[in-house]
Swiss-Prot record:
Domain of life: Bacteria
GO biological process, one term: polysaccharide catabolic process
Protein name as annotated: Carbohydrate deacetylase
Lineage per the UniProt record: Bacteria, Pseudomonadati, Pseudomonadota, Gammaproteobacteria, Vibrionales
Protein residues bound to Mg(2+): 59, 122
NCBIfam families (alphabetical): PRK02134.1 (NF002559)
Function of the protein: Probably catalyzes the deacetylation of acetylated carbohydrates an important step in the degradation of oligosaccharides.
GO molecular function: deacetylase activity; hydrolase activity, acting on carbon-nitrogen (but not peptide) bonds, in linear amides; metal ion binding
InterPro entries, per the entry: COD_ChbG_bac, Glyco_hydro/deAcase_b/a-brl, YdjC-like
Family indicated by similarity: Belongs to the YdjC deacetylase family.
Cofactors: Mg(2+)
Keyword vocabulary terms for this entry: Carbohydrate metabolism, Hydrolase, Magnesium, Metal-binding
Quaternary structure (record): Homodimer.
Length: 251
């Protein structure tokens, strides 16, 4: 089995950026997704160019910060996106507004001189039933994988599973290994969502999930994790492993 440790929220704060890079340089993270248009974007760009082996996708925003477009449908008439607490009850997303915003974020990412690895979203917003088909369309257009859907633009030949079990109270090295071993016989590629970071003041102000990220960072950079993965024949990879995969289970 191969495992993708994808670090979310690149670009959110410098503490997040530095934690992701640390987990890449000294740990098992080979993949991250960037929130464009956030306060630490420029710092993320600099770190991305300094770490060319770190694969980077777009962490689409529909619940954090301000949109890049001006569709009031995405903000309920405010200056910022709808709140996470409002997302799942909102049933009037306009397809064109969602498409234009997601495309604007992807286009902005590409304008930075970065190569698009894959797509996912903040707060799993892309799994909203009115948003998912639009993001799948964009994944097809850019011929990149989408979290939870795998490859949308061609048939896949091996099984892929996305897990969000490595989060909050479930963060531990032993728990992570037990979870991966429980999946090993059933899937070829597993993506583990993760959020390594240094809990700087901007992160504490922006997110209710801040201090816990430092524990994730400790686990993801532990030499013991690398040893145990190797011992059990689990290879660390990135989303390029999904280029020719087929069967999808997950979000």
């Amino acid at each position: 089995m191969k495992v993708i440790f994808n670090a979310d929220d690149f670009g959110l704060t410098q503490g997040v950026n530095n934690g992701i890079v640390k987990s890449h340089q000294d740990g098992v993270v080979k993949s991250t997704t960037m929130m464009v248009g956030m306060d630490a974007e420029q710092n993320a760009i600099e770190l991305a160019h300094q770490n060319p082996d770190l694969k980077i996708g777009v962490h689409l925003r529909f619940t954090a910060g301000a949109p890049l477009t001006e569709h009031p449908n995405l903000t309920n008439g405010r200056t910022h996106f709808v709140k996470y607490s409002e997302l799942w009850n909102k049933q009037d997303f306009e397809a064109q507004a969602v498409y234009d915003e997601a495309k604007a974020q992807i286009d902005h990412f590409l304008s930075l001189g970065l190569t698009l690895s894959h797509l996912d979203s903040h707060h799993h917003a892309h799994t909203h039933p009115q948003i998912l088909p639009i993001v799948q369309k964009l994944a097809k257009e850019h011929r990149v994988p989408l979290r939870g859907s795998g490859i949308c633009h061609q048939p896949m030949t091996t099984s892929y599973f996305f897990t969000d079990e490595f989060y909050d109270q479930k963060v531990s090295l032993d728990g992570l290994m037990q979870h991966l071993l429980s999946l090993k016989e059933n899937y070829d590629v597993v993506e583990v969502m993760c959020h390594p970071a240094y809990a700087d003041q901007p992160l504490i102000m922006k997110s209710g999930y801040a201090l816990q990220r430092e524990l994730e960072l400790q686990v993801l950079t532990s030499p013991i994790l690398k040893e145990q993965l190797a011992q059990h024949g689990i290879a660390v990879t990135d989303y390029s492993a999904l280029v020719s995969t087929s069967q999808v289970v997950g979000v």
